[in-house]
Amino acid sequence: MEDSQLYQALKNYPKLQDTLDSIENLEDDTKSEPSECGSPTERGIPSYYLAEELDECEEEDSEEDDDNLPTEIPDPPTVDMLEAIMEDEIDDTAYQVHFEAKQTWKPVIETGGNERGKFTLSVPQNLSALQLLQWETGIHALAERLGGCRLLQISTRGTRDGIEFTVRETPCVSPASDPIPSTSRSSSIASNVSTRQTESPGSKSNTSLGIPEAPANLIDMGAIDKEFILAAISPSDPPYKNTLRNLFGSGDSFEQYNQTGIYSLKELVIAGLKRKGIYNRIRIRCHLEPQFN
């Protein structure tokens, strides 16, 4: 009964038959379309089948590559083999490389050879440009100050290795016109010792240069081994005693310094004390008026 009523209600629904027909046609079209979910169709091959064929191709390619590889792997080249290859490719005679030997640093280098009083003060290592300039300026200034001494004449010259010093001794203020032979000085009596005669302020030589004449009284060569005494300033201190040979170190040094023979005994003693490095100590303690025993 209920089915008949439902049927009557649906039957009375407008265009019901057309709607049912369209639904049936839609179902037929859906069944006739090809499946795209992996079923065999005329348009292509399923994806899973393609994946299997791709794997097989890769395996075949890898097998072909393995066939092309050598059956035995050679050993790596040794050091001897590499050296042999390098010797064949490079000509050692075409290249000449010279390395300077590393020398140890020395503070003073003798550069004069047979010439005395010539040496080079080496440049200190690891100096900056400013430090090197200050070092050179200080050394030149010191040499200029020392060069003003009566007994020495110092000249400096900058070189690649350092500063070259040339030291010359100046035994006299002005050379004598006629040097006295050493034989005449050695033949004099040792006890005949006198000091230089003083000149008046207005007395000068007749030469055009106006240089004072050399004193006539000279120190005898025989006095070099005679002991002299410098009296102490303080009565409690002992006097200073020595000889000219000991002050100058040897008879040759004294002979070289006193070539002209124009120095007085006092000047010779002062020069000897300076050579020995005790001048300042002695002049504070003693009177610089030597007397022979």
UniProtKB/Swiss-Prot annotation:
Coiled-coil features, chain-numbered ranges: none
Chief localization: virion
Site feature location: Involved in oligomerization: W135
Keyword Phosphoprotein included in the entry's annotation: yes
InterPro entries: Phosphoprotein_C_viral
Site (Interaction with the Nucleoprotein-RNA): K274
Region (Interaction with the L polymerase): 46-103
Residue ranges, annotated region (Oligomerization): 106-167
PTM sites of type Phosphotyrosine: Y13
Stretches for region Interaction with N(0): 1-55
Annotated spans, Interaction with the Nucleoprotein-RNA and template-binding: 268-293
GO cellular component: host cell cytoplasm; virion component
Biased segments, Polar residues type: 197-209
Effect of Q103R: In strain: Isolate CIN0309R
Domain of life: Viruses
Protein task: Nonenzymatic cofactor regulating the function and conformation of the RNA polymerase and part of the transcription and replication complex. Binds the viral ribonucleocapsid and positions the L polymerase on the template. Acts as a chaperone for newly synthesized free N protein, so-called N(0). Plays a role in virion assembly.
Listed name of the protein: Phosphoprotein
The species this protein was found in: Chandipura virus (strain I653514)
